């Protein structure tokens, strides 16, 4: 009798221990599932990219800290984002038409997917990058640039590619017919007015400088050279999207809510104050252009203009910048941002 009782007690204890262990595992699994996904997102220039201030307004990021945690990461240029993505140090890279093909074809990121739009040059008749000469230069047409010095922010950049395309249309070839120098965007006005270059590239906010407006003239725009340009869009690797789809849709929902808040004229004063604080600039510097038609186009639904992007990439191929064709649609996954936009209706 006593032996039977001892066996019963041992069995009961064993079963109880097993049950407790199973419950502990379930609790741990539940805790693991509840941990928000860390999403590191790269950005290069603000306010062209809103990533560093996306959720500065309280109440916009309703899923932040629940299903995901957004961590903005600054980079000096797009190639650095590609490197970070390659080694698993970045979940979202903000790339453009001029850098995306290199990520896929040169860096081996064949699984990189385009997931949401950021800014477009010349989209919906919004601002397009200016290529400017001095009013008294005597340069009236693109053909007049033969033998001249042209300034770009960097050889191989998107604005340099547009410059090459426009001049090639007039029969002018790089090195043979003109000289290209490099200069940062903030110095472009001085480069032009001091006579160091005959043509400069100017974009927001520098293009609205009163002295540049008074002494300079737009010879052509980037839209004139190549139509609408996909300057920046979000990309992520297919494997990360598959494992964290719900969190990604939540992030995109919050980001669309934030972009729409910034674009709403009713919020413009507060939006400018946020940017001014972050960039340590006076609000007056943004008032004439930010979040208006004088700014780059931002799609409120986050939809990438794939037709424009394909045209941009095809031009790169024609100019010999890339060595193989690339089908943008095969590398796009806009289902997530579409689902996010539906939630906001």
Where do the model's predicted regions map?
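Secondary-structure end/capping motifs
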Residues: 242-323
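Sec/Tat signal peptide C-region and signal peptidase I cleavage site
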Residues: 28-34
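Bacterial N-terminal signal peptides
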Residues: 15-28
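Conserved C-terminal helix/tail region of periplasmic/extracytoplasmic solute-binding proteins
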Residues: 313-345
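N-terminal secretory signal peptides that target proteins for export/translocation
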Residues: 1-12
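Short, glycine-/small- and polar/acidic-enriched structural segments
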Residues: 35-173, 179-182, 198-201, 228
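Pocket-lining segment of extracytoplasmic ligand-binding domains
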Residues: 98, 137, 186-278
């Amino acid at each position: 009798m006593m032996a039977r009782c001892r066996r019963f007690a041992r069995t009961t204890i064993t079963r109880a221990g097993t049950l407790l262990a199973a419950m502990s595992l379930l609790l741990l699994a539940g805790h693991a599932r509840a941990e928000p996904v860390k999403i590191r997102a790269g950005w290069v220039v603000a306010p062209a990219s809103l990533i560093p201030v996306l959720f500065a307004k309280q109440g916009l990021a309703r899923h932040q800290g629940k299903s995901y945690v957004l961590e903005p990461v600054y980079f000096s240029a797009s190639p650095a984002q590609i490197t970070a993505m390659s080694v698993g140090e970045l979940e979202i890279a903000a790339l453009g038409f001029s850098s995306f093909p290199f990520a896929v074809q040169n860096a081996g990121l064949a699984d990189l997917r385009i997931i949401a739009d950021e800014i477009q040059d010349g989209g919906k008749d919004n601002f397009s990058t200016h290529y400017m000469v001095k009013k008294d230069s005597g340069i009236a047409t693109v053909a007049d640039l033969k033998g001249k010095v042209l300034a770009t922010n960097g050889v191989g950049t998107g604005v340099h590619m547009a410059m090459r395309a426009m001049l090639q249309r007039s029969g002018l070839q790089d090195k043979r017919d003109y000289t290209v120098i490099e200069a940062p965007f903030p110095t472009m006005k001085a480069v032009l007015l001091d006579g160091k270059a005959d043509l400069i590239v100017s974009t927001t906010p520098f293009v609205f400088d009163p002295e540049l407006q008074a002494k300079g003239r737009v010879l052509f725009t980037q839209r004139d050279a190549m139509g609408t340009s996909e300057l920046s869009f979000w990309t992520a690797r297919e494997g990360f999207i598959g494992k964290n789809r719900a969190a990604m849709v939540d992030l995109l929902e919050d980001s669309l809510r934030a972009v729409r808040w910034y674009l709403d004229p009713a919020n413009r004063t507060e939006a400018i104050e946020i940017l001014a604080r972050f960039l340590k600039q006076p609000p007056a510097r943004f008032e004439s252009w930010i979040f208006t038609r004088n700014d780059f186009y931002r799609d409120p639904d986050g939809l990438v203009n794939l037709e424009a992007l394909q045209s941009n990439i095809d031009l790169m191929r024609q100019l010999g910048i890339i060595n193989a064709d690339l089908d943008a649609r095969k590398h796009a996954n806009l289902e997530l941002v579409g689902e996010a936009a539906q939630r906001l209706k």
